[in-house]
Amino acid sequence: MAQSCTTEGYLDAMKEVLVLTERRYEGDGSLSNMPQEYVDNVLQEDGLVVDALVRVGFAAKRVAWCNDGIRWDARGAALFRTTWDYFDRWETFSAWLNHASNHTTLFNDAGIIRWNLDKHYLQDLEQEGVAVVPTAYVPKHGHVPLFEVCDQRGWNDVVIKPAIAGGAFDTYRVTTRGDGQEISPEPSNGSNSEELWHGLVAKHDMLIQPFLQDVVASGEVSLVWIDGQITHAVKKRAKQGDFRVQDDHGGTVKRIDVSDELVQLGTDIMERCTRLCHDRGWASPLYARVDLMRDDNEAWQLSELELVEPELWFRFCPPAADALAQAIQGRLQA
């Protein structure tokens, strides 16, 4: 059953930009069951964007994407930020996206949103020449044993994840050793790897990727890209004994300086992505997060390119929020 959302006013022509969140984080975030520090970070991040939009002349406010009181048939703009429940409510979200995109300017472009929601986009980027973490794709209800894919690829340590999900939802590391297998995190029902795999592929299109040891040793680097330039970068590290770098699972994040080489790599990835978008008739991406890991040969590979609702860590670089607001102003005035 779809979750009900509060009623809040109307979308007021081109002067208003809605900063989209989810129901749990609307208002003061009191409906969330996450730790208060986590909620405070969400509110701070969105608040920095709202304030930046106000500084360039918009009437900006945060609302849940499912807010029943928003008139999407009026002119206006909406910016995806913390809409992290979309995969929990996929059918409802998809219907909303179809409706809103017919009446409202969305950032990023609705075509980009639809494309990037499904991790099969990695195939498209690889075809554009981007070095992507090697990935095997298994369709929902696909009768392919996990061990068979791993044997064919020569992988004995893999990450399995849904094609449509976020925050490491239903994501596991499966390691095969001479004396058996280890699954992290341990399945709550005690299932073995094949039982776990068949349960997941019964629900989702799935991805299988080799586990890259450097994500534990050094972490994952994320480059934040706003309207044509890398504004800042962070490094995410998993907590001891885990591989998931998300703060939902105890991971930590800090701002870092990155080499010119890495900035150029991120820029090149975004140029290739932008060409792909133009070829498909979409607007250029407004914002992105480029997530990179080193492989076992110390070469950088793209793990994900987040174009829907990435955390962009404006609290580490507030001027990037101003750059985002100015870019929105420029596009709406064009």
Show which residues each predicted segment covers.
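Extreme N-terminal starter segment of soluble prokaryotic enzymes
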Residues: A13-L18
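Phosphate-binding site of ATP-dependent enzymes
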Residues: F169, T176-L276, Q301
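Structural detector of well-ordered beta-strand residues that form the stable sheet scaffold
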Residues: A78, L106-F107, V133, V159, ...
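ATP-dependent carboxylate activation and anion-phosphoryl transfer catalytic cores
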Residues: F243-R244, E261-A334
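Rossmann-like NAD(P)H-binding beta-loop-alpha module
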Residues: G129-P162, A168
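Conserved N-proximal alpha/beta basic substrate-recognition cap immediately N-terminal to
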Residues: Y10, E22-K140, V144
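Short, solvent-exposed loop/turn elements at beta->coil junctions and helix N-caps
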Residues: C66-G69, P210-D214, V290-M293
